[in-house]
């Protein structure tokens, strides 16, 4: 009886994991050069991006990804990133977005998830974790645990009346707020 029950639970969880990993979460808006996913499928303009995908943007290549919550990710050459979590409710703009940049350069323009709840967008890098607070920023990371973070979008002294954003960088021990562009 116990073995049958455990087998049933295992099969059920396998189906849930399979359905989550095939959840459409965004689209490649622009693809230039050699861009593949973990299945070694070539990604082109209009290719769908799914929960759990790992994207590989090769040398002399770049891509722009548009997510359902209107987050825009511009991915530079020699970048590897994984979408660890993406949950979005378009009715309430609630959700969670976690990406892991193993190497390369990615520019973010945060979307509705971060605007509704800034703590719900997280970027993992070899050097630590970054939380975005409704802004535009760039992350450049290498596999040697070095990362550069640049705040691009409206800082506290902007003259356009825009709500200032910031990013928060943590290495697991220390936390730093980046509040001014540059």
Report the location of each language-model feature.
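Sec-dependent N-terminal signal peptides
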Residues: 5-14
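Flexible, surface-exposed loop/linker segments and immediately adjacent secondary-structure boundaries
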Residues: 22-54, 58, 67-182
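N-terminal Sec/ER secretory leader and immediately downstream segment
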Residues: 60-62
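N-terminal secretory signal peptides that target proteins for export/translocation
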Residues: 1-2
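Sec/Tat signal peptide C-region and signal peptidase I cleavage site
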Residues: 17-21
